[in-house]
Design a protein with these regions (language model features):
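N-terminal Sec-pathway targeting helices
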Residues: 2-18, 22-23
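Membrane-interface motif at the C-terminal end of an N-terminal transmembrane signal
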Residues: 20-32
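Tryptophan-anchored aromatic micro-motifs
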Residues: 30-49
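Conserved glycine-centered beta-strand/turn positions repeated across beta-sheet architectures
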Residues: 35-37, 67, 152, 163
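Short beta-strand segments that buttress and anchor functional surface loops
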Residues: 39-43, 139-145, 163
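N-terminal glycine/threonine-rich, aromatic-flanked beta-hairpin/loop signature
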Residues: 49-140, 144-153
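Short, exposed beta-strand-loop hairpins at the edges of beta-sheets
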Residues: 144, 151-166
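Short, low-complexity, Pro/Ser/Thr/Gly-rich segments in the mature regions of secreted, periplasmic
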Residues: 165-173
Length: 174
């Protein structure tokens, strides 16, 4: 009887070790698949009014994450939107000078400075960063400097990351 009990115990322990190893390997593969930079189209009411394309990035590195907007990319999108606005509204240099600007370029420069601050700088200042963990299809974010934790189910299909709770769909860019 004692041999049977020992075999059972050994079998149970080996079984548990196999299950733990499979879970560890599965999560390890998922971690590697998750690491990189992901992007999705981001918008604000102001950006929609201006018809400017914004992109939010989600960067995942070894144990760390951060959300951010690229300043230079946003700058290029804003300048393109300003050009379209001036063309579509048929605004002249005289119209801009009458509004208190020195020139169309001066107007764009002032708008750009303000918009970059209000869109990109404010966003990046408030965007989350911290550590992360995954466990069997659940992604846990732990934000730096706070006790806030955010948990969501996720899946990755064909370089697309689906964060279920928010309904976010991100595409891998790096």
């Amino acid at each position: 009887m004692k041999k049977f009990d020992i075999k059972r115990i050994i079998g149970f322990v080996v079984g548990v070790m196999i299950v733990v190893a499979v879970l560890f390997i599965t999560d390890g593969k998922a971690e590697k698949e998750l690491m990189g930079t992901w992007a999705y189209a981001y918008t604000t009411e102001y950006a929609e009014d201006l018809d400017v394309e914004l992109t939010e990035y989600f960067e995942v590195t070894e144990g760390r994450y951060r959300w951010y907007m690229d300043r230079e990319e946003t700058k290029a999108s804003l300048l393109k939107a300003y050009d379209e606005y001036f063309k579509s509204e048929e605004i002249t240099e005289e119209d801009v000078i009458d509004s208190g600007y020195k020139s169309i370029e001066d107007c764009k420069a002032q708008w750009l400075e303000e918009d970059l601050k209000n869109i990109v700088d404010d966003y990046n200042e408030d965007a989350g960063a911290g550590t992360w963990q995954i466990n069997q299809g659940t992604f846990l974010f732990i934000e730096d400097g706070t006790s806030r934790e955010y948990k969501t189910e996720y899946r990755i299909d064909d370089n697309t990351l689906y964060l279920q709770t928010d309904g976010l769909i991100l595409t891998k860019v790096k």
